[in-house]
């Protein structure tokens, strides 16, 4: 059976510093879920646990008290509205969420491809070769942690933020070693974490299809399961999301067996 698009597990509210849109509220996110027939949605604002050293000046205000301002989330019959976060991984591969905090979150999204945060995640002057090596190193670091992987999502593996230009971005994806991707995604599949189908990752032109899909094709071949994430920061970004998700499902030939289920 074809993969059914019935969820969105990566949504920001106005509490995320990169959003701050007054209409990006839990109530409007719930309306978006109802309008699209979703059974599960999850709020995932940017978060750095204040008990973990190393937060950048941008991340530091986005602490526990800050993201918990969304609670309690509005609930209606037929829709699971969950409370999660999108954290980060610094240059030393320190995760921005402490082990104890996982119990307070329904879902934790970990982006290993935020290679645009100078000083926090990168120096800023890395070559494509170095960025490809970081892609491998950072995912490897996360998969080597002692985490409750049944509620962990690996965000946007083909994120445009991997490099400062489209040319370098595509070059970086080409440089990802096939054998390393196979090793990492085989491990991810065995651990049971989800791999994100981020709507923004699937807006590429046709001529880029082969290169952008590389990580996803390997992940599928290795038995990984996938979840949909709009990564929306404001209401207008909900427009076209279903078409992007459908494109991902069709290009990868996903079925219900390929779906990550957040229990």
Language model feature labels by segment:
Residues 79, 151-153, 257-259:
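Residue-level recognition of the N-termini of beta-strands and the immediately preceding loop/turn
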Residues 2-137, 237:
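A metal-dependent hydrolase metal-coordination microenvironment
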Residues 22, 48, 110-206:
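Divalent metal-binding pocket/active-site signature
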Residues 34, 143-147, 220:
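Non-catalytic positions within long, well-ordered alpha-helices that form the structural scaffold/packing
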Residues 51-53, 156-158, 162-163, 235-237, ...:
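Flexible glycine/acidic-rich beta-alpha junction loops that bind and position SAM and/or redox cofactors
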Residues 35, 102, 148-151, 251:
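Alpha-helix termination/capping residues and helix-transition junctions
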Residues 1-14, 167-263:
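Charged catalytic cores and adjacent phosphate/nucleic-acid-binding surfaces used
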